[in-house]
């Protein structure tokens, strides 16, 4: 089962994935955790270019293409060979929709066209953790273990457009996207997600 987790900066995805992995392993499921951009050696190198806050000259189209390239490598190396497992993936195609199609105003048609390969492997289930961008960025700033990246440094209006994009996407693909209020405690969000996963496994 291929499960993805989406949300703006500071939405708690990484923490939740670790908690879910621990529980699913205890229940004897074969679990793989991974992330985008990244997840494999080559894809992680692309990630470092994308998120390096010194690379301010990256254009919107280049950014979108790099995300798509990282995703293709990740699919071939990690996702497709492990589709018989429970895959918990931190971000996937919906991040490109929210950040590039809406946040960068590139539009859904362009983003879908460069991600046509990934569209053949859509998640079985996606959890979108909805959170006000200011709350999320404040959380990121308070987390000293988090290194501020290029996307964290974007202005508030960009992050607001990303959130609006996620809401639109959730309406477009409601058959696979579960929207969760990110203002709840991590434990409450975890329980909602776990209940949804166990219903489908």
Swiss-Prot record:
GO biological process: dTDP biosynthetic process; dTTP biosynthetic process; dUDP biosynthetic process
GO CC terms of this entry: cytosol
Reaction(s) catalysed by this chain's protein: dTMP + ATP = dTDP + ADP
Keywords associated with the record: ATP-binding, Kinase, Nucleotide biosynthesis, Nucleotide-binding, Transferase
EC top class named in words: transferase
Positions that bind ATP: 7-14
Keyword Nucleotide-binding listed: yes
PROSITE patterns the record matches: THYMIDYLATE_KINASE
Pfam families: Thymidylate_kin (PF02223)
Gene3D superfamilies: P-loop containing nucleotide triphosphate hydrolases
InterPro entries, A to Z: P-loop_NTPase, Thymidylate_kin-like_dom, Thymidylate_kin_CS, Thymidylate_kinase
GO terms assigned for molecular function: ATP binding; dTMP kinase activity
Family indicated by similarity: Belongs to the thymidylate kinase family.
PANTHER family: THYMIDYLATE KINASE, UMP-CMP KINASE 2, MITOCHONDRIAL
UniProt-recorded name of the protein: Thymidylate kinase
């Amino acid at each position: 089962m291929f499960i993805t987790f989406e949300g703006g900066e500071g939405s708690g995805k990484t923490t939740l994935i670790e908690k879910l992995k621990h529980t699913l392993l205890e229940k004897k499921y074969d679990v793989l955790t991974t992330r985008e951009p990244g997840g494999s050696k080559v894809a992680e190198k692309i990630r470092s270019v994308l998120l390096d806050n010194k690379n301010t000259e990256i254009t919107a189209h280049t950014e979108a293409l790099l995300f798509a390239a990282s995703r293709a490598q990740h699919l071939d190396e990690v996702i497709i060979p492990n589709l018989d497992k429970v895959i918990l993936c931190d971000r996937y195609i919906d991040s490109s929709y929210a950040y590039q199609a809406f946040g960068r105003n590139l539009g859904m048609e362009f983003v879908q066209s460069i991600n046509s390969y990934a569209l053949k492997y859509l998640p079985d289930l996606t959890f979108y953790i909805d959170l006000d961008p200011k709350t999320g960025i404040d959380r990121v700033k308070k987390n000293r273990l988090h290194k501020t990246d290029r996307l964290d440094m974007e202005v508030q209006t960009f992050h607001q457009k990303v959130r609006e994009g996620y809401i639109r996407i959730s309406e477009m693909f409601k058959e696979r996207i579960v929207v969760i209020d990110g203002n709840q405690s991590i434990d409450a969000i975890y329980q909602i997600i776990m209940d949804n996963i166990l219903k489908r496994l």
